[in-house]
Amino acid sequence: GPDMDVPAGDIGVGGREVGYMFGMYKKLTREFTGTFTGKGLEFGGSLIRPEATGFGGLYFVNQMLQAKGIDIKGKTVAISGFGNVAWGAATKATELGAKVITISGPDGYIYDPDGISGEKIDYMLELRSSGNDIVAPYVEQYPNATFVEGKRPWEVKADIALPCATQNELNGEDAQNLIKNDVLCVGEISNMGCTPEAIDLFIEHKTMYAPGKAVNAGGVATSGLEMSQNAMHLSWSAAEVDEKLHAIMHGIHAQCVKYGTEPDGYI
């Protein structure tokens, strides 16, 4: 019910589709409750909800690095996908001082040694909204970048790897490539982005690995914040929502450290 379930969008379901469902829900129940989340702002949606999963993922990854005394500034980041999650992750990574060097789609991946920031991140949204589901046109817009057809970005040397596309997108072979290239941290921002084989390899090699249930909680956390705003008939600013999201992700990381630290110090 409206106080228990948190329906929200995912691949192929955005604010428009949630809006359709919320409209029918209102018609059937004659109630305006915060049942559906990821709604448009005019229906009681929350600011930064579309990018919240990516934002929260970077807050968690940054906490992981800080716990090991590593500064995220200047680190290179390999991101897969080019939808809302990848867009949010690229935006926040850039804001924190990291350099995003890849995005990907079903057709292959983009490697941009100059970094994907500013207008390039905005162009990701243009690619997504085109409906073609391809990233190849990126190199026409930014010729210094390289498009690698039919492959995933995990063969690129990067300090941080962030699967942001779909399930099972990072397998054992990909994990071996990342480990060979001395990746510092892997954050599973997509749901079940890493195969069990890949996860086992990261743990075996003591690579910092953030499981999806922790690192991608920012999306559903912000859905909860959207429900809170609806219940109180309030609309918080983007900065307020972002601050609360940061606090939630900080708390989740603290719990992971508390209960996930092994005798040798590996978390």
Q: What is the meaning of each model-derived region?
A:
Residues 64, 179-267:
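Adenosine-phosphate binding glycine-rich loop
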Residues 108-209, 214:
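Rossmann-like adenosine-cofactor binding region
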Residues 1-47:
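N-terminal ligand-binding/catalytic initiation module
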